[in-house]
Amino acid sequence: MEQPVGQPAYVLHSRAYKETSALVDFFTPQGRMRAVLRRARGKGGSLVRPFVLLELELRGRGELKNVGRMDSSGIAAWLHGDALFSGLYLNELLMRLLPAEAPFPAIFEHYTLTLQALAEGRPLEPLLRSFEWRLLDELGYAFSLSQDVNDQPIAADGLYRLRVDAGLERVELLQPGLFRGIELLALAEADWDAPGALLAAKRLMRQALAVHLGAKPLVSRELFRKR
């Protein structure tokens, strides 16, 4: 089926393709789409950069489509420094985790709002953790932050480990990688000012994402580490 005319889109990734074309991965409300951009060294090629909201028309019925029309739509989210690395991280998560051509309009909207917030200079960590959690939720990988795997309420004085396939499990013995109940309850309320909440959220999201990302390291994470 032909793709809708004039759908909003962002560039997630691009690379040279044949002599004068580019192979571009787009993120649209209808999902992650891959398409060939002909004459990529011309006017259209100047728009192939991340964080620019585009109006896009794709042609073709197969998985590899062709860019029929592409125009800038609105103001780009200009990201610099750590905000730029954060934006690249979001793009890499979407490239690695989103199935091709599966609609995720809620993720698209959250992504747009997150880019705007990054451009405004808002604190990075809450934005990244919120996006990671929304992505897990929309993909069906989320788990309860207020109840454990036995449907018992998370206890503020309890210790928990994450079982990625089931959720949070209370444990009695200290071991690496545990989470305090009081931190989990803060995360359930998105209370980023609570002591230890941001660090716990970072550890929790890293554990939750790892099994879905696989063993291949994230390039954006390495860039952030070496900045």
UniProtKB/Swiss-Prot annotation:
Keywords: DNA damage, DNA recombination, DNA repair. InterPro entries: ARFGAP/RecO, DNA_rep/recomb_RecO_N, NA-bd_OB-fold, RecO, RecO_C. The keyword DNA damage applies. GO terms for cellular component: bacterial nucleoid. Pfam families: RecO_C (PF02565), RecO_N (PF11967). One of its GO terms (biological process) is double-strand break repair. Gene3D superfamilies: Nucleic acid-binding proteins, Recombination protein O, C-terminal domain. Belongs to the RecO family. Involved in DNA repair and RecF pathway recombination. This is DNA repair protein RecO. The lineage of its organism: Bacteria, Pseudomonadati, Pseudomonadota, Gammaproteobacteria, Pseudomonadales. The gene is recO.
